[in-house]
C-alpha cells in the first residue's frame, strides 16, 4: 500500500449543529501551509503525531493530546513521523464558543483566549474523541448533541481559558 493510499478524509457538518464542522482524517504525506481559521479548531490525535508551528513555537501533538488553534492565529501542519497522523477535529463558529463563555460568566460576545496549541489532558482528549465519534454516527438526539457539545466546551474554557477578550 502506498503512503497516499493510507490517506483518508471525512469532512462534514452535522445536520443539526450548523455552527459546527467536523473532520476525521488520516494523513501521511499531507502538509498544510501557513493559514488561519475564522473560528476555533479543537481536536485530538488518535494515531501518529501532528507537528505544527503556532504562536512562535514548533509543537507536536501525540495520541491523547488535544490540539487547538484560536481564531485568526496562523499555523501550519504536517506529519511528525513517517507514519503520518490520524485526528478528529471540531471547527467551531465563534458563536458556539461565545455561548460557552456566557454559560460560565454571564458575559456576552466574549471569546476565550487559550495560548497553548497542545494540551496534555487525557480526560479532555477522550471527551473530544467520544463526542466526535457520536456525532459521526449521528446516534444522539438533537438536544443531547447540543447539551454534550456545550458541556464539553464549558469544561474546556473553564480549565484553559486564560482571559476573555471582546470580539
Summary of predicted features, one role per range:
Residues 56, 92, 157, 166-167:
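Proteins with a high burden of low-complexity, intrinsically disordered sequence enriched in S/T/G/P/A and R
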Amino acid at each position: 500500500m502506498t503512503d497516499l493510499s493510507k490517506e483518508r478524509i471525512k469532512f462534514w457538518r452535522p445536520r443539526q449543529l450548523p455552527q459546527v464542522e467536523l473532520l476525521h482524517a488520516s494523513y501521511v504525506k499531507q502538509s498544510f501551509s501557513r493559514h488561519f481559521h475564522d473560528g476555533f479548531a479543537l481536536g485530538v490525535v488518535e494515531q501518529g503525531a501532528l507537528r505544527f508551528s503556532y504562536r512562535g513555537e514548533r509543537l507536536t501533538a501525540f495520541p491523547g493530546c488535544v490540539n487547538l488553534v484560536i481564531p485568526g492565529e496562523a499555523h501550519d501542519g504536517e506529519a511528525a513521523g513517517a507514519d503520518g497522523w490520524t485526528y478528529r477535529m471540531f471547527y467551531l463558529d465563534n458563536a458556539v464558543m461565545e455561548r460557552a463563555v456566557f454559560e460560565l460568566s454571564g458575559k456576552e460576545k466574549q471569546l476565550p483566549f487559550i495560548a497553548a496549541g497542545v494540551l496534555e489532558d487525557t480526560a479532555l482528549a477522550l471527551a473530544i474523541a467520544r463526542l466526535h465519534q457520536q456525532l459521526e454516527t449521528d446516534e444522539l438526539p438533537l438536544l443531547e448533541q447540543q447539551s454534550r457539545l456545550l458541556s464539553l466546551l464549558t469544561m474546556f474554557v473553564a480549565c484553559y481559558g486564560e482571559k476573555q477578550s471582546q470580539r
